[in-house]
């Protein structure tokens, strides 16, 4: 029994456990489904069999029920997420129960039960709900009077409603919850889905004003829905006077603020009390409730009043508020009438200004009303403007005005308090400047070729622009030719002209043929800007060549036969393609006296020309060659054509005959009827022979005696007539047919006893016509004289003859060079400031080399030699060209310079030589060529008044015109300004100082100080402003001319003068980059509209010519990658004498061009500095970055000026140098005052270094040694150094600096050094010393800045730049503020060797000045200049890169770019 009991108990436990687990499973499987009332919801379950039953509670749902839809769908296994362990798929079913239009009654448990199998079931709990929503509420804005009751409500739809509803419904005020609101709120349930939520106040007061919001929250506290209702509690208004001010003798301005009590103000009432009276009275004006300010009037002047204000709304009147102070009216009304004037204008704007109001009226004027009207009989208002009063009284600019139009302006002052304005000012007239004109109308371009003179011209005509936009003063004509030649494609021009109004046409002569010309014409108004261009074009037809070179020929013996060998020149086809060449031989009849021009000579056949009875000289075509088969050497008289290939000859002749279509192939001679012998008269039968017998002798190599014999024989031959019937038809060779058209070109055997000449005919095809050009006659030649045999290679006599001749020539050359060498070493090395000297070597070189320059045939030369031609030098060859000429103490330069022409056959100086004009020349040998001189307007009919020592000089490709002039003298300043005015000059380049070498070089032709004015004749000059840079001064001069006639407009102009400061007479700048930058600055502001550039120095030839030449050569180098220095200077000297006056200046051209060719433009502007330097430092995939390449060029560039270090290298001074590699140059070393009884006491290892302004601003020194500390302090005292920079560490060792000061004071010879105090700063230590020269009892205060942050490793630079920047700022500012006036007082900096660290500091000081004053830097040029002044400066790429990095940081730190934009 016990066992049975235990088993029954165990079974019962298992059953109970199963039931419990099943209950848990059932409970866990119930799914909750929220169903929105009014929407549909679907319940899904899966089963293995199709038969399932759906129940709601215990009620089975019928499939036919209208509110339910039941469907079953088969689906694959695992779709419900269960695992399928069988190997093959089996089918399950998805059962869906859809509840339609859910309502509250649909709430309950739904069960899906399978009717077969294990009766699995799935239970769903459906809970209907409605989302909360406010259906209705109190109006959005509700008003209640104070102490009235009010109820706010919200009708809310929501389901289910339960115990949490009260907690989830809240009223908020102004967005916040308040506990008192729960006290006044209530909830009333209307039905299962609607409730009313109310907020009720029995009495409302001002504090109940606000916005209330009924809100439904969820259980987490998030807002579900809400509705805002604003409650306004109305009360009487409250008004307070904020501001009161008397604005007139009987007016007071009031301004107030108001609380309207949530009800619009209807009226304001003002009560007032006059001081001294007991009661307040109402003001006559009732003020509308919309006002917050008002002007009260009808007060007594200069009387004090007390004011009150009351506001009224629908609730009632508020309490009166009184302004605390009494208001006293003015004794007069404040009236200000501005005095207006125009202060500036442009083409579309006019700026006006007026005087500021007096101080006592400023408070009553807040703005101005301005009116601009277009002038006329009835002024037309263009614009009205409001301009606020400002403390700076800034002017006002009207824009968008018409150009060159008169306007009238009026201004009146207005008060913002009274809303009234004072009287208008008087009308002021202003005129806008001229604008940009539209294009000229009716532009006509005609290309014309004159067949007689063969001249080409282009006629251009135009009319005024349709809309000039001002007064047109001139027209700019731009003519550019595009050659049609396929061989020579060099562009013609551009040629630029300026034609003054009222002329509307111009003529370009001597233009090139075979060119398509494009012309642009633009009008220039007084605004100096080009107008819209009108463009046209025309085609100049082809023409024959301009020149046919000399044809050389000689007689040769070919196979025992006499023939003529011609050397044909290659002729340019620029003017048109040459299709054929024809060679004519002329057999000269010795009775002829002269030949007609080749084009007039009758042409016969070979047979006719060689007839024995021909009595006049005739020509025949000996050879005809097309351009296709052109060859430079031709044999005549060999009875052969130029080629033995018949196909070539046929093709050649076909080309030439086609070229000659429409033109007779031969010019046939007239038929000559010869009378019987004896009756032939000279006048009918003879042509005169050549008139110049010398040419005949020379051409035939005959003596006078031989010539007489030859003429006698030829006359005998002519008298022997071989045919009685027709002597003309007799021929030398009777076997040749008398005439055959196929033999019109026949190179027959020549008559050895006849004189021959010839000429070359060039044929150019122009559409339907053939154009011919003819060479001059060849030199006369007689084959009968000894001919030059065509030598065989085995002819030893020939080679022996050549060897003897060559040896003689070589011996002569050796002798000449020996003579040159002797005279070269005897010549004085120190030339007198570059003046030209003519030595024996000069004479010999001129005799040897002549002046071989094909482009300068007008040079005055000796003999028949042509000028020297150096030829163009490619950019890459500039360095070698400079070095080759630099050898042997600049012998190459000297030889080339001495070949420059000083005189020209086509240049005269008659006007300069006139007695009346001699006093106008500063130097008697510097004259102005008559052909290119600047002519002034004649005064009172005196012709000599048109003279000034100045010439027009054309720049590269005629793109720029200069006027090169001598510096004005006191007696010529008026003429100088007349020239500036008449030539419309706007840019002056001055290259001299007023005094040099204690001699006057130029008179001062501008006023003394800025804002001063000075009269020069009719010209009034005002010194407007001045800007100084390191190399030059830029001055702005405003110039006007006295009116010639009453009513004439006064013409005002602005002239800019660029005064270069550091170029001495006869000399050349030591560093080329300064003058190159100067030229670039001038070019950046130059335009054709600004007229020619006036350049002058003292004489107007040396420095002036060098600058003009350099400007042209730089342009040529940039465009062509090569330069022709010699030819350029020759061309310039042809326009003004002696341009580039000294050898040093000529050498400088090479140096400057080498600099430009090597480095280009290295200037970096501040606005692009960061990106430009980043681009330089950006490394390509392979190779080095641009900055590294630039630095390597910098290291490779040798200093062209030899600099000795002899003093520092003396054995006695070696112990004073830390390194024998770093020695100061003699030329700029610091020289100490010698000490008595002590030798070599003047030396210290220190160098003067030029600063930004090219003065010796700095001293760079090595760290003093123990034995040179006294010398160091002597240098400080003698140079009056007040600022000392130390960039080294104190200590012992080769790279350390000894402590060269004591804690108190120490004396070195006569120098006493007293230490005062020190101050530690973040990047440096500052120390003060007193240095006393005991000899002269002079004490100097010296401030030392010791930099603390430099890396101790040699060659390293600081990682960050801030420390150096701070040092530069502090030290350089101290130097500027404390340097001793009247002496150099240079800033002295020292490091170990006086190289790397010191050079970085000095470079940064220079670059900072450059950046601040010019808004750009040239680190490359600054580095090159520094390196030329002391060995070892900026000697590594790391240092060079640091400068670039540091200057960017300096600009960013000091916001220099931003200040530039401002």
Swiss-Prot record:
Subcellular location: Membrane
SUPFAM superfamilies: (Phosphotyrosine protein) phosphatases II (SSF52799), Fibronectin type III (SSF49265), Immunoglobulin (SSF48726)
Residue positions with a glycan: 40, 58, 64, 85, 109, 119, 162, 191, 196, 209, 255, 288, 302, 429, 442, 451, 516, 613, 701, 755
GO cellular component: a single term: plasma membrane
Keyword Membrane attributed: yes
Cystine crosslinks: 45-112, 154-214
Domain Ig-like C2-type per the UniProt entry, residue ranges: 29-125, 131-230
Function: Possible cell adhesion receptor.
InterPro entries (alphabetical): FN3_dom, FN3_sf, Ig-like_dom, Ig-like_dom_sf, Ig-like_fold, Ig_sub, Ig_sub2, Prot-tyrosine_phosphatase-like
Domain Tyrosine-protein phosphatase residues, every copy: 893-1156, 1187-1450
Protein name: Tyrosine-protein phosphatase 69D
SMART domains (alphabetical): FN3 (SM00060), IG (SM00409), IGc2 (SM00408), PTPc (SM00194), PTPc_motif (SM00404)
Membrane spanning stretches: 806-823
GO BP, one annotated term: synaptic target inhibition
Enzyme class: hydrolase
Family: Belongs to the protein-tyrosine phosphatase family. Receptor class subfamily.
Catalytic residues (UniProt): 1097 (phosphocysteine intermediate), 1391 (phosphocysteine intermediate)
Domain Fibronectin type-III: 237-332, 334-435, 439-547
Lipid bilayer topology: Single-pass type I membrane protein
Positions on the Extracellular side per record topology: 29-805
Catalytic activity from the UniProt record: O-phospho-L-tyrosyl-[protein] + H2O = L-tyrosyl-[protein] + phosphate
